[in-house]
Amino acid sequence: MNRLLIILLISFLGSSCESWLDVKPENQVTYTNFFEDEKDVEGAAFEMFATEAAYIGCEGDYLKWQGILADEWSDTYNAPRLGRFSDLAGGWGDGGWKHSYDIVFLANTILENAHRASMSKDRLNFWIGQASFTKGLAYFELARLYGDAVITKNSTSLEKYGRKPMLEVIDTAIVNAERAYRLLPVFEELKDLSGAAITSKQYASKGAAAALLAHLYAWRGSVIELYGLTGDAAGDYQKSIDYCTLIIDKKAGFYELHSSPEALCQAMSKMGGENKESIFELELNPKEDYAQAVRVLGVFLTGYPVNVNATLAAQKSRSFRLKWTTVEQMYEAKDKRVDAYFYLDDEILNNLQTYPYAYLRKWREGIYFTSSSGSSETTMGALRANQVQWRVADIYLLRAECRVKLGIADAKDDLNKVRTRANATLYPAVGENDLKLAIFKERERELLYENHRYADIVRNGKTYIQKYLGYSLATDKGLEENALKYVTDQDLKDGILFQPIPESAFLMNGLMRQTPFWLRYVKY
């Protein structure tokens, strides 16, 4: 249904005096009086959805820039690319902390008060499931961005909080995601308060909760190994496999691979359209300003011909550039993803020496904004597509990754399921003898610019971090090397992979502590 999108257009920070973020926590009477019927709960949930859509994985998360695959970068993004820690400590990406806790607050408001509203038990479970899922997703974001983080008790407490260990933060996410899995129906059975079928995949479902849990357990197992923490990494990998299997076997809803990469790209390019491969999405707000419109990471590389105002030469000015020679090294010539993901015609071929770039068309339509100066000229500021958080190909490859870590031979079958659709040579192709690396590279090819690569690198451990995040890059300052190229075990334990806690979190809170690594660069 499009009703969620309509509400997002209306409600997202559009009337701050009525915003739940502006309701003071101590005003418990306001909560009690507000939740009278299900429509009131729905209203609170819509603001939660809007905040979730605006901030989960958005531009403020500088870690995504470290993971992006590109040959050339504009200087604006060189700080995260090169790990310029003094620049990053100056506030690059501070919003992730506040926005994640805004989402937690809104979810807690529903969890603590939905029972006051008059509705059936099934409908109450539906909204508790939605809020639990969103809260779990927010804590997952906090664990990945900051490691140790605050775990709030509720939406009304005014006490000061210190940070809890990263594994406790992940466990909090898991508890909420598991509650969502228990309470929510499969996507095909989701209904709104009028009884109409829900078609927006920003609503959580049993399948979305399973996908979140699959990634949570894969992440927990990986960080236990990476940081030498106490825990059962093998057990976590098996749980991730189990949740992936529920999705693949259609026991958590009906999801399946599209017939071809071209069919996938067409489905991902239809905002709000049916996409049988997609499991959970964040709704694009096509009317909002630039910050809200930036959803799909690929927008930063997408120019000609998707951008109707762009030329071949304009690709040089994109924030990130991928060279065509890199595409040729990544994909076999027969791989159907080449034609689906990239545009190639005689004009491009004839100008490769002058403009040696790949022209991305994985998402096919732009959104244009008129200049604020009053000019009639338009600028493509976004792609008309929702941000697909998880899809079936991701789940096959995540299961393969966890299986290979446990030495399970079936990992090869999961990898080849994705390769078969792409018409790529099945594993092992000539020269392939490292299944773990082959799975990582397949995720790189299949999920290109879908905001997975940074997490994929970290899950694969220190050697991958050094090789795939430790860039050397020619800049205006000369050749610069990312310190991650030489990262030590102590650097990792000190928190080099996390964003610094923003200064605002320390205001009137003597319990807050900075991540040890960042004490080299900040005084708070």
Regions from the language model: what does each represent?
Residues 35-56, 76-146, 158-171, 175-192, ...:
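Conserved, well-structured interaction surfaces
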Residues 4-12:
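Sec-dependent N-terminal signal peptides
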Residues 393-397, 409-425:
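Active/binding-pocket-proximal capping segment
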Residues 38-40, 45, 49, 53-56, ...:
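Elongated scaffold/linker segments in the mid-to-C-terminal portions of large proteins
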Residues 15-16:
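C-terminal motif of bacterial Sec signal peptides marking the signal peptidase cleavage site
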Residues 59-70, 185-207, 222-302, 425-440, ...:
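Short, surface-exposed recognition loops and adjoining beta-strand edges that mediate ligand/DNA contacts
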Residues 143-145, 150, 188, 219-228, ...:
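Short coil/turn linking the two alpha-helices of tandem helical-hairpin repeats
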